[in-house]
Amino acid sequence: LRCFKELGYGNILGVDPADVIAAEATKNGIPTISTHMNEETAKNILKEHGKASVVTANNVYAHVDDLAGMTDAIKTVLAVDGLFVFEVSYLLDVVEKMLIGTIFHEHLCYHSVRAMSRFLKSQDMELIHVERGPEQGGAIVGYVQFKGGPRDIQESVAMLLKLEKERKLDKPHKIRGMYEGLES
């Protein structure tokens, strides 16, 4: 969150369930509360800080067992024209590069653009841009707004949906192929 402070954002708040990380961030000038992001936390943030123009979740969605609940909490604090930005390991890279370490790293979920797009639509939100990156062996950064928000959906979303279809990421044999590759 330091980058937002450096860009001049004034009302910055971190949320992290790890006490040590929250304390260290606060000590370094980024006020951070030590708790999970859920509806109760969101209501407290809203009451004390108001709506957020930007909400980020870097490598958080992979560890959450209630994705809809966390997304509801994010929606509670996000301004109607706000932007939600998340980073997750990219399922296509996990499968094609056989990133078994990613799987053993306590991740509960692995994300494709197709699945995230569908999930977000069910939450009255829309994926408007996606970037691929090298983090964790392969990651995506998704940019999200409320459905019908002020930003256009970028070509990057359609391009990665097309890539996933071409690579047959939606077919069970693709995942089985990873399993078979690990067995050999």
Segments the model singles out, each with a brief description of its role:
Residues 1-9:
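Conserved SAM-binding loop of SAM-dependent methyltransferases across substrates and taxa
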Residues 68-85:
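A short glycine-rich, Lys/Arg-flanked "PGG" loop and its adjoining helix->strand segment in the class I
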Residues 53-56:
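A conserved beta-strand element that flanks and buttresses the S-adenosyl-L-methionine
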Residues 84-109, 113-120:
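Short, glycine-/aromatic-enriched active-site segment of Class I SAM-dependent methyltransferases
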Residues 28-44:
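Conserved SAM-binding strand-loop segment of SAM-dependent methyltransferases
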Residues 10-16, 34:
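Conserved SAM-binding motif I beta-strand of class I
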Residues 18-20:
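Conserved SAM/SAH-binding beta-strand->alpha-helix loop
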Residues 136-183:
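Flexible, glycine-/basic-rich loop-and-beta segments that form/coincide
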